[in-house]
């Protein structure tokens, strides 16, 4: 057996043993004669594994890794092997459910009763129009998803922004990737990684920062393990985390740091380079391709800026007060000393509204900012394990810096939620690029800072499609008039249709519901009431306020339980779709089986709802706020050949171009397409009649229209048919060729086009006009271009707004486990995965357990200023926190940990920090 086969078999077996189960032989590739196999994509994380799925008698009967898939090469993790079983849980939603009273009328306090699709859409239309007519375009909201198919996300975006003229659509990817997006946009001027997974096999060094890859990206971790075992002496692995986890098992160095101090560690590495190893700097790379930059530090923490908000409990207020002002301790005052502050000073957050503003600084200013981050200071601030000596911790920091600095050593830095879910998440993303740029180790085979995506299409749908409240497809934004013009032309809607004011980000949609500013919300492909911090507020907002909540889901999760209307959604292999993964690889699949019960795809739900709105209801004059009124575009629409009585379905989704897509396309031969042709279930549609399909290839139309946004400016995608013939392609796809390393003129068509005589070109055009300044502020208003250059940011170390205290002495971090996906809505229905990990545990150190008089398995209360939950203690498990920190995963609705967490965010990205709040632990 060769090494790779050994790794593969060991990974499968270890994944199964972790879950406490044996892998069925059918899931390891045994093939039945009457099974029909086809390629598809795994439903779970952002790795983007290819799978083969088998269908028989109208059901998915087996899945296995796809040997032809370049991402996973035939291997799946334990969740991947159970893709089939997620679809057939006993409580699968099969009919719409509406809260009603005994008279059959909608009643917010009523019980759920089954209704027809027509009755469901009638009530949904009524409640939407009530909120829309009362509050306008800001009165409604859509909780979107990084698990939408690309076509679903595109349809939702188009309906919201071109149809309803609202920007209040935001994906749960705001919770997972928004800080990475800001890091990319601020640094490169364009989103998504420069490298690819091939870097793993080419690098000498893998350094993980807040990324427990062994459990969260296990297939990529198998490739890392393979690389490590291929050259034990040369290849080094370092795991940086706030607690010990399985990623440390093959690590040469494990660094346990105090929450938030990753900011200080990055600056220490940069200081080592600049002050002690200037010869390691790639001065030509820096001079030719980079500028130095910074921004304001006094930007708050993304909390409400009114601690006296009527919905706050008294216990919450002392934390929320820090949104406006903090008192500096010695450590934070040292890091901010360039601002002229000292310990004990009140530090006011004066620049909350311009958190993303940045300007160019000199190298000398950059060097000045790094001055405090000596080894002594950084070790004292960052050491996270009380059992480790300061000297040992210092040695590890030095070894870490040396690995980066070593001249010919290739280095890849990976990170995920430990970086992104962070009140300074955008900053710490920028810091990773800072170090790689200083050394010239970015956008090169085997070297680069690489943000790993959490969800299967957080890149492909949330980011590339632009289902964020401020975005449009292909990195365009609603605030840019040129971008709106491009979008309106592609969508064939009148000029000035699109609302130029960004909408509410995900968490703010919740706050708007609580404040009565939004009275209609539609949840699609996610579970916001379980996945949003400080959940007690949002449960009350859903159940006690005058609003109407619609949840499209496949199982009754917490969000469905607090909803007013539940719509049963088709699951992944019951529809056509596409996902985009973390290495920019786009992959498509075909519908394999019919949906269960009366479930229908989210695309169908979006299009059917669009039928209920005439242009005159939505394209009329609309007041956004006291400063902005959207003009009526009905006359312009008439000039384009539309009638004011046309529906949004007619104009946006069933137009002449759409109808040209042949429903009998050769690519679809032999496969169902419920949206296009209906199916044998004879579903009674939203009009009460049998739904027989749209009569045109709607998924192909949506894809081909969507790809127009990216063609010609670095976001090129291939045509629909091509993706069904390959195992994905990494964009930009130019002349049929994918791109492995962006910005490198040897590999990237657009880099070569931008700078034909150079080796690199950072050609993104976002925020490439800068003013000059120093570490404190910009010094002039005159802007200059930094075309084709990237930014090396200085960002200071700052602490979390809520930290352990005498009353709440523990840090709380949340996250995932290998066996379950997100809120557990799907994986908790798989018997094998449920038996393996039936509940979320509170992982804590044995020393803390002894101090509290706890035994293994005891039930405890985990309580913060916001709420409390019961959980069972695990002091001997896979995760080993240091003294003073506990880890509780969030997949278990019976351990509703987001009742405890703090809704603080990165002020730039608006991404919640789920990794840091203060709690007390006591026996239940």
From Swiss-Prot:
GO cellular-component term (any): periplasmic space
UniProt superkingdom: Bacteria
List of residues binding Mo-bis(molybdopterin guanine dinucleotide): 79, 147, 172, 176, 209-216, 417, 421, 527, 552-553, 575, 602, 814-823, 898, 915
One Pfam family cited in the UniProt record for this chain: Molybdop_Fe4S4
4Fe-4S Mo/W bis-MGD-type domain segment(s): 35-91
Cofactor binding notes: Binds 1 [4Fe-4S] cluster.
GO biological process: one example: Mo-molybdopterin cofactor biosynthetic process
PROSITE patterns: 4FE4S_MOW_BIS_MGD, MOLYBDOPTERIN_PROK_1
Segment forming the signal sequence: 1-30
MF-aspect GO terms: 4 iron, 4 sulfur cluster binding; electron transfer activity; iron ion binding; molybdenum ion binding; molybdopterin cofactor binding; nitrate reductase (cytochrome) activity
InterPro entries recorded: Asp_de-COase-like_dom_sf (IPR009010), CT_Nitrate-R-NapA-like (IPR041957), MoPterin_dinucl-bd_dom (IPR006657), Mopterin_OxRdtase (IPR006656), Mopterin_OxRdtase_4Fe-4S_dom (IPR006963), MopterinOxRdtase_cofactor_BS (IPR027467), Periplasm_NO3_reductase_lsu (IPR010051), Prok_molybdopt-oxidoreductase (IPR050123)
Residues holding [4Fe-4S] cluster: 42, 45, 49, 77
E.C. numbers: 1.9.6.1
Modification after translation: Predicted to be exported by the Tat system. The position of the signal peptide cleavage has not been experimentally proven.
Cofactor(s) listed in the protein's UniProt record: [4Fe-4S] cluster; Mo-bis(molybdopterin guanine dinucleotide)
Compartments, as annotated in UniProt: Periplasm
Catalytic activity: 2 Fe(II)-[cytochrome] + nitrate + 2 H(+) = 2 Fe(III)-[cytochrome] + nitrite + H2O
This protein's UniProt keywords: 4Fe-4S, Electron transport, Iron, Iron-sulfur, Metal-binding, Molybdenum, Nitrate assimilation, Oxidoreductase, Periplasm, Signal, Transport
Binding-site residues, substrate: 890
Subunit architecture: Component of the periplasmic nitrate reductase NapAB complex composed of NapA and NapB.
Family per record: Belongs to the prokaryotic molybdopterin-containing oxidoreductase family. NasA/NapA/NarB subfamily.
PANTHER family: PERIPLASMIC NITRATE REDUCTASE, RESPIRATORY NITRATE REDUCTASE
HAMAP family, per database record: Nitrate_reduct_NapA
Function recorded in the entry: Catalytic subunit of the periplasmic nitrate reductase complex NapAB. Receives electrons from NapB and catalyzes the reduction of nitrate to nitrite.
Name of the protein in question: Periplasmic nitrate reductase
Native source species: Campylobacter jejuni subsp. jejuni serotype O:2 (strain ATCC 700819 / NCTC 11168)
């Amino acid at each position: 057996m060769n090494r790779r086969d050994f790794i593969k078999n060991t990974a499968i077996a270890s994944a199964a043993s972790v879950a406490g189960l044996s892998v069925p032989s059918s899931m390891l590739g045994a093939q039945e004669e009457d099974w029909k196999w086809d390629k598809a994509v795994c439903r779970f994380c952002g790795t983007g594994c290819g799978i083969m799925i088998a269908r028989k008698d109208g059901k998915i009967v087996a899945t296995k890794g796809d040997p032809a898939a370049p991402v996973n090469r035939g291997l799946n993790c334990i969740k991947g092997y159970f893709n089939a079983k997620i679809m057939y849980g006993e409580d699968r939603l099969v009919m719409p459910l509406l809260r009603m009273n005994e008279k059959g009328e909608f009643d917010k306090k009523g019980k759920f009763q089954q209704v027809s699709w027509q009755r469901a859409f009638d009530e949904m239309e009524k409640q939407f129009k009530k909120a829309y007519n009362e509050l306008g375009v800001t009165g409604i909201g859509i909780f979107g998803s990084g698990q939408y198919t690309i076509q679903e996300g595109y349809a939702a975006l188009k309906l919201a922004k071109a149809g309803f003229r609202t920007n209040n659509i935001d994906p749960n990817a705001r919770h997972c990737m928004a800080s990475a997006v800001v890091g990319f946009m601020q640094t490169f001027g364009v989103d998504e990684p420069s490298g690819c997974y091939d870097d793993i096999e080419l690098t000498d060094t893998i350094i993980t920062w807040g990324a427990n890859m062994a459990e969260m990206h296990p297939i990529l971790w198998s490739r890392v393990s393979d690389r490590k075992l291929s050259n034990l002496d040369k290849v080094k692995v370092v795991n940086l985390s706030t607690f010990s986890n399985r990623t440390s098992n093959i690590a040469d160095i494990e660094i346990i740091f105090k929450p938030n101090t990753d900011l200080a560690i990055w600056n220490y590495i940069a200081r080592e380079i600049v002050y002690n190893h200037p010869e390691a700097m790639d001065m030509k790379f820096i001079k030719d391709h980079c500028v130095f930059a910074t921004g304001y530090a006094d930007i708050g923490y993304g909390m409400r800026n009114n601690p006296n908000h009527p919905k706050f409990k008294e216990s919450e207020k002392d934390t929320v007060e820090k949104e406006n002002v903090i008192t500096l301790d010695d450590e934070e005052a040292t890091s901010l000393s360039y601002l002229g502050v000292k310990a004990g000073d009140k530090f006011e957050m004066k620049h909350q509204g311009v958190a993303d503003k940045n300007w160019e600084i000199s190298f000398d200013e950059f060097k000045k900012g790094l001055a405090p981050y000596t080894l002594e200071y950084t070790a004292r601030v960052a050491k996270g394990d009380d059992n480790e000596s300061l000297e040992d911790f210092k040695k590890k920091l030095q070894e870490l810096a040396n690995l980066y600095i070593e001249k010919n050593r290739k280095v890849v830095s990976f990170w995920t939620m430990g970086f992104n879910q962070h009140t300074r998440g955008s900053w710490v993303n920028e810091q990773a690029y800072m170090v790689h740029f200083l050394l010239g180790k970015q956008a090169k085979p085997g070297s680069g800072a690489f943000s790993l995506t959490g969800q299967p299409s957080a890149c492909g749908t949330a980011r590339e499609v632009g289902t964020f409240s401020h975005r449009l497809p292909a990195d365009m934004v609603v605030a840019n008039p040129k971008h709106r013009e491009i979008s309106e032309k592609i969508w064939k809607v009148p000029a000035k249709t699109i609302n130029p004011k960004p909408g509410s980000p995900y968490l703010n949609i919740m706050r708007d519901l609580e404040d009565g500013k939004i009275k209609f919300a539609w949840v699609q492909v996610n579970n916001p009431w379980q996945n949003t911090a400080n959940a007690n507020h949002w449960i009350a907002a859903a159940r006690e306020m005058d609003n109407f909540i619609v949840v499209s889901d496949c199982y009754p999760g917490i969000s469905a339980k607090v909803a007013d209307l539940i719509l049963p959604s088709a699951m992944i292999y019951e529809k056509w779709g596409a996902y985009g993964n973390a290495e920019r690889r786009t992959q498509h699949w075909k519908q394999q089986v019919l949906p269960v019960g009366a479930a229908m795809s989210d695309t169908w739900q979006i299009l059917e709802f669009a039928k209920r709105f005439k242009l005159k209801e939505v394209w009329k004059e609309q007041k956004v706020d006291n400063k902005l009124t959207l003009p009526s575009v009905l006359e312009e629409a008439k000039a384009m050949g539309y009638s004011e009585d046309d529906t949004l379905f007619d104009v946006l989704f069933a137009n002449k171009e759409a109808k040209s897509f042949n429903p009998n396309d050769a690519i679809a031969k032999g496969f169902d397409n419920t949206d296009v042709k209906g199916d044998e279930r004879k579903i009674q549609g939203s009009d009460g009649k049998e739904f027989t399909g749209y009569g045109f290839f709607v998924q192909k139309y949506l894809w081909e229209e969507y790809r127009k946004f990216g063609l010609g400016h670095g976001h090129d995608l291939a045509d629909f048919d091509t993706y069904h013939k390959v195992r994905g392609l990494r964009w930009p796809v130019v002349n049929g060729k994918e791109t492995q390393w962006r910005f490198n003129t040897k590999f990237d068509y657009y880099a070569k086009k931008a700078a034909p005589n150079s080796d690199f070109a950072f050609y993104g055009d976002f925020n490439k006009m800068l003013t000059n300044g120093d570490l404190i502020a910009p010094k002039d208003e005159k802007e200059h271009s930094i075309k084709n250059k990237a930014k090396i940011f200085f960002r200071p170390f700052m602490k979390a707004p809520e930290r352990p205290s005498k009353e709440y002495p523990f840090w709380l971090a949340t996250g995932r486990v290998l066996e379950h996906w997100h809120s557990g809505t799907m994986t908790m229905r798989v018997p094998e995965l449920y038996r393996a990990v039936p509940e979320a545990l509170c992982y804590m150190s044995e020393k803390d357990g002894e101090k509290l008089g706890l035994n293994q398995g005891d039930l405890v209360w985990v309580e913060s200023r916001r709420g409390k939950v019961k959980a069972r203690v695990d002091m001997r498990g896979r995760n080993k926190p240091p003294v003073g920190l506990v880890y509780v995963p969030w997949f278990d609705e019976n351990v509703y940990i987001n009742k405890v967490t703090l809704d603080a965010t990165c002020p730039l990205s608006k991404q919640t920090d789920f990794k840091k709040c203060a709690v007390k632990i006591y026996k239940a």
